[in-house]
Regions:
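Short Lys/Arg-enriched alpha/beta "domain-start" segment
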Residues: 1-54, 152-160
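A short, Trp-centered hydrophobic/proline-enriched beta-strand micro-motif
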Residues: 22-31, 57-59, 144-146, 176-180
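Short acidic-glycine loop/turn motifs at beta-strand connectors
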Residues: 31-32, 87-93, 182-185, 192-203
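Short, surface-exposed beta-strand-loop junctions and turns on beta-sheet-rich folds
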Residues: 35, 43-44, 102-103, 195, ...
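Non-catalytic accessory segments adjacent to catalytic cores
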Residues: 45-151
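Short helix/loop capping segments that flank catalytic or ligand/cofactor-binding pockets
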Residues: 67-70, 89-91, 105, 156-157, ...
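Cytosolic ligand/metal-binding cores
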Residues: 95-98, 198-243
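Active-site pocket-lining segments that scaffold enzyme catalytic pockets across diverse folds
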Residues: 111-187, 191-195, 238-243
Length: 243
């Protein structure tokens, strides 16, 4: 697939996102590589890793958990997607990639909205019981590591503005990966200081962060200390086993 490249400088990458309000779209800020990728309008479902090289960028989504049966996740994941339009910022350059005809891109002003919301989840009692069970299990030696998660529901009297949320995530999380994916009126957004796996050519890297060892100051741990610490090694083995 041939992509045409045009220089394009926007005040915010979220402005590109706003130019495609009714399309499937993806937003990605990579702090490690200092790269921003915004894609819009599905071009193709990528068949496999070999087919992936026919496109400038592809987005892979997966829920990972077999128990994710909630309708809100229906149709999201388990596929690689190539987009028709991309906005890229990397190596001091900003440009617009498009397969086929270009569209006029406006530098839309991104709204900054303060959302007033409240938690409306109703499972706090179940969560407390789960935490007590985990604590008892660890105390009795039945388990060594548990990663627990809970879905929390928030409700606002006004619609949540995704563009504003993305902008706030970018501005307030300078050391995180920022992501957004919108499909069929549903949007998955977030920020994380870690990614489970990065695949580049023959390299597979993991940015998995955990632990409380100091990284700065006079008490900062050295590379040798981290690699030889028994507790740290046990945690790594447990994480790899769980993965």
């Amino acid at each position: 697939m041939i992509y045409n490249k045009e220089p394009l400088q926007l005040n915010s990458p979220v402005a590109f996102w706003l130019n495609f309000p009714n399309e499937e779209r993806v937003f990605w800020v990579d702090r490690q590589s200092n790269r921003i990728v915004v894609g819009a309008k599905r071009l193709a479902t990528v068949k496999d890793d070999e087919d992936r090289h026919n496109y400038a960028y592809v987005f892979y989504g997966d829920t990972f958990f077999d128990t994710s049966k909630d309708p809100k996740w229906s149709g999201m994941g388990h596929e690689m997607i190539a987009f028709t339009h991309y906005y890229i910022v990397e190596n001091g350059e900003a440009f617009y990639l498009h397969a086929g005809e270009s569209v006029s891109i406006e530098d839309i002003e991104v709204p900054h909205i303060r959302h007033d919301f409240r938690e409306t989840s109703d499972d706090k009692g179940d969560w407390d019981r789960l935490m007590n069970a985990i604590s008892d299990g660890i105390g009795h030696g039945e388990m060594t590591k548990v990663v627990a998660s809970r879905e929390v529901q928030f409700t606002s009297d006004t619609p949540f503005n995704v563009a504003s949320i993305l902008t706030n995530l970018v501005e307030n999380n300078p050391n995180c990966f920022i992501f957004g994916y919108e499909k069929d009126g549903r949007t998955f957004v977030g920020a994380s200081p870690e990614i489970l796996v990065r695949h580049r050519g023959s390299e597979i890297l993991s940015y998995a962060l955990a632990g409380t060892a100091p990284k700065d100051g006079p008490n900062a741990w050295t590379k040798e200390q981290l690699l030889s610490d028994k507790k740290n090694l046990l945690n790594i083995i447990s994480s790899v086993t769980v993965s």
